[in-house]
Every structure is written in structure tokens, then in C-alpha cells.
């Protein structure tokens, strides 16, 4: 159906390019091509603006679409919550929550991610916005345990991990979410705030 809708989308939203990437597992289950039956433009890097924040999105290397637009209002709200606080962003990906916190007036922002490419992209996005953020390339679970041992605390902590659950019966994935949240909660300062996403 997407090929039928594209002309209408172009007309309504004055779009210029099309990039379609169907999740490999979904394409297999639905028996559809990974392109959704649409010839995509050969687009890799695109700069966007969201609530005044600039991002560079990598469609070829990013997770899913390269950017999670459904979190845009949450990123803005997070920035408002960050004013005057020390902020920790776990599994920071492209830096959306970190950058919003820094631009929202956070005292200090620390961002952690396991994926080197994500950390590099987050750094580029922070530079686009002149946002001061301490980035760390590390496994969140190991890093959290070290911070707990060191007695570190943050006023505002967010955990927005990648997909851990790969099926209805994936108990390992459920355990990972539980473990991440249990560890992260130990780093929240008294009267601090904790945000978790999945």
C-alpha cells in the first residue's frame, strides 16, 4: 500500500525524498520486501531540526530509522526537567536526551553508550548544538556497577536501552530490562528523578 500513499504524502507534507527500510524480521513475517515495495532515494546523512535542536541522522547505520521521532516531545520535556540538575543518559544513542538536557540548562550531563558509532554520532550532534556533554563508550551494565561502587549519584537519570526482547517468550531480554533499571535506580540522588523507556 505504501506505493499508493507516497504521492499523497508528498503532496500533504511537501516531502522531497523517500527512505524506506522495513525491519528484517517484520519483512520476513509479513512476506514483504525490506524496501516496502518502494524505491528509496540514496540518502545516508540528513540534518534535521526538532524543537530548535539540530541533529544529523545516519539512515544507513542507525538503528531502525536512525532517529526515534516518537520521542520528540519526551526529549523536550526531559530538557525542561534537566534545568540545574546533574544528568545521566544511559544508552544515549544519537544523544537526543543528553542534548536536550544540556540545552535545557543542566549543570552537567553524562552520556553512556556501548555502540562506538552511536557515541560518535552523539558527539557530532552535541557539537552541532554547542552542547557540553561528557560521553563515555562503555557497556551500561558494567559501567553502572562501577558507578555504584564509587558512590556516584545523579539528580536526573534516564535509561533508554535498545531492544532487548526479541520474542514473546524472551525471558533473558526481560531480565536485562529489570537489571538495567535496578542498577540505574541506585544512581538516583535523594529527591532525584528517574525516567525509563523501552
Describe the predicted segments one by one:
Residues 69-85:
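Conserved alpha-helix/loop element of class I SAM-dependent methyltransferases that forms part
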Residues 117-158:
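S-adenosyl-L-methionine
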